[in-house]
């Protein structure tokens, strides 16, 4: 992924009312395990994923399903309460913590399924998912799904990424720039699922 696709420059909103009213910050999957003091165990499972015994892999899957189900329910409740954007950041999933092999396994075996599941209620409620630059970078490099990162020109320039997402008709999933970005925004990066068939 090129540096111009993911822009990490950020200024923090001085007036947070628009942000607080519309953006729900959903914990990342690994952050949830950290909150439960089981992150180190999950890290070890991810790093040894391919060589895990079947029963251990099943235990990991049950743990993951429990956390993902809880996060999906939390996102649904937020959307039902009037939030417009589910903001996803999972700093504990970076290569700094997992290494390249672990990050690849995390994106391919865990995160992409979660993202697909989260996309459904967002579409139902007319909401959006925004993915932070770091997580966007991992998806771009390691995702096996047919996902296209596409820059979309907006109908006008906005003063922040948040305003662009809220006031412009863009795809459900946006990525790359930080949700807190302030400055001229006249295009936005969206994630589009390419069709696998020829129809």
Language model features: what each stretch is:
Residues 1-199:
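Active-site loop segments of alpha/beta catalytic cores
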